[in-house]
Amino acid sequence: MKHLQDIVKTLHAPHVEGNTAVEILDVTADSRAVKAGSLFIALDGATVDGHDYVNKAVEAGAVAVLVSKPVEVNSDVCVITVEDTRAAMMSCVPNFFDYPANSMRMIGVTGTNGKTTTTHMIRHILKAQGHKVGVIGTVHIMIGDTSYPIHNTTPDVVDLQHILHQMVEEGVTHCVMEVSSHALALGRVTGVEYDTAVFTNLTQDHLDFHKTFENYLAAKCKLFEQVSKPNQVKSGKGAVINIDDAYGHRVVEKTTAPIITYSIDGSGTLNAHDVDMTPKSSRYTVSYDGHDYTVAMNTTGLFNVYNTLAAIGACLLEGISMEDIDKALKTFSAVPGRFELIEEGQPFAVVVDYAHTPDGLENILQTAKAIQANRIIVVFGCGGDRDATKRPIMGRIAAQYGDVVYVTSDNPRTEDPVQIVKDVEVGVKDGLREGTHYEVIVDRREAIQHAIQHAKPGDIVLIAGKGHEDYQILKDKTIHFDDREEARAALKEI
């Protein structure tokens, strides 16, 4: 709870009409979430203008409104006018919640792929040390052991600050957070002071939003510039960077904080080598500070070796010993929808994975090739209203690695699913090897059933793109759809 006058002080050149001595009990930009004592922030969005809902907010109990254009208010509530309500929101909302990030250790993980698994590994290690940990990411929000649903990888400013405040109230000491390029570019994490920044990798994605790869890289680098800023509230900053990635050196240049680089090529300060993998596990040696440690994991894939190194680096910066990290990792289990094995007693492997980028798809296919002697059967599609340039690239990758490829729908959203499939098919035809078979089955359920029905002993069926998601977004509705459920149902029919 704060007085409006305290919030107004954070704004640039506000024009105030009304009483600023009122108490503010909540802040929101969603008129549907307004309650008595709220400050309503009117945002002019791409499809909806919050200024049209000012009076609805007042009727619901708002005692003040923040606007950027003239409005007729049917009440004597305080009206604060600024040039840009979105920019104002980024400064006043963290202030309202008393900058909760300053009361926790904040670990931000950014990169195209690997964010979710890395954040969960970090959480697992921290929890093993007795810390109460919060997680914000693609799969869910976690406060201690309680899970809550999430709609964006990184929530908007209001939701994020509310979540962080709740974490502090519930005694969370460490928050591990996936930080998306959208959030960094749009300022959603303004007011969050990170202690450790982790870079996993950078490959093609989100070019529909960022337009160029340089813009995409620049957005990611904002996190590392932030941990380098002088005169921050908290001390003990650090960065963990994948130096094997083509852009790792560029990220290194963006921070002056202490850095741990990681590698499997031997070029990092933290290195993995002698990697041995099975379909369900991996074992390798990690070298750090002149010592070697044998790491045994219940996860597989070279990409997970990288994820583990990122998590190790972050926890080393948190002061946890390599011995304690190693001990905790032995009990880590795979994250839902991340190379998740579906087992119903069948004589072949079925894996569900979230891979929805060219690099992500190639990673899981390379893993399948390394651990499976027989055929690789791929079921995948590409999302609508997203970066269309990656569709033929992913099609080509699927055809280059897969022995049988089923091109299907993902989340078509407002686009025609048939056209999306055609875009993917261009790449599939380009990458076809001799003996490779591909088929278009637009209905995702049918594609999964077909792939499983035609699998032979020793094959591996990779169902890629949706992972943990339990929905499918169509043009006019969102339906329940879970690749794992569909795979199990199909397996029970064979």
Language-model features and meaning:
Residues M1-H15, A36-L39, G313-E323, K327-G337, ...:
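ATP-dependent carboxylate-amine ligase
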Residues M1-S91, N95, A246, G268, ...:
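N-terminal leader/targeting and accessory segments in enzymes
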Residues L39, A64, T196, G238, ...:
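Well-ordered beta-strand positions
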Residues V63-K69, A239-I243, V379-F380, V404-D410:
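Short internal beta-strands
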Residues V67-P70, V179, N201, I243, ...:
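Short secondary-structure boundary segments
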Residues V71-S75, T196-V350, V428, L432-E434, ...:
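Acidic, Mg2+-coordinating active-site environments of NTP-dependent enzymes
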Residues S75-E83, Y148-H151, T256-T261:
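Active-site regions of enzymes building and remodeling cell-envelope glycoconjugates
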Residues M89-I241, H249-T255, L309, I371-Q372:
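Phosphate-binding loop of NTP-binding sites
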